[in-house]
């Protein structure tokens, strides 16, 4: 049975240049929206990583504090032991003859001066407020083409990304400052450890002389 001519598919009307531009604009809007979503997700991941790093640095700082307190306690104990050794040496007459006088430990005052890891230092990075953030917020982050819900979401996403980037920058400054403080503290701990080691060696030598 021959097909009804009225049911034949009408030939496709070619799109006008305006329609082509509108289709392209819709595609660009979809791609841009997905890009802002990915940016927001990456910022969230970076924020979580930054928080974990700050927590780890805080835990590490507490461990360093305990180590340094231990060094200070060893130093205090050794001072007390040296007083006792001096008293025993006097009782045993070791110090009567200059040739028999034992060598006392000479302490470097700079090693045991007050801890400065918690003080503000001149090279501590300062947080700088960027006025461009406010200017961007007033003018908008994107150039609107379709003026639909997608562009509203893009604008909101970009605002959140801008805020997160500012927070990440501040977190990075905090990390850098904390690392500088901890590096100085590690240097102090090393100096105190070397001082305690030398002090113990001298005390052992004095004790051996008492036992002769």
Curated annotation (Swiss-Prot):
Keywords: Coiled coil, Repeat, Synapse, Synaptosome. It comes from the Eukaryota. GO terms for cellular component: cytoplasm; membrane; plasma membrane; SNARE complex; terminal bouton. PROSITE patterns: T_SNARE. The keyword Coiled coil applies. InterPro entries: SNAP-25_dom, T_SNARE_dom. Signal peptide: none annotated. GO terms for molecular function: SNAP receptor activity; SNARE binding; syntaxin binding. Residues 26-88, 148-210 form the t-SNARE coiled-coil homology domain. It is found in: Synapse, Synaptosome. One of its GO terms (biological process) is regulation of short-term neuronal synaptic plasticity. Disulfide bonds: none annotated. Exclusively found in brain and ganglia. May play an important role in the synaptic function of specific neuronal systems. Associates with proteins involved in vesicle docking and membrane fusion. Belongs to the SNAP-25 family. This is Synaptosomal-associated protein 25. The lineage of its organism: Eukaryota, Metazoa, Ecdysozoa, Arthropoda, Hexapoda. The gene is Snap25.
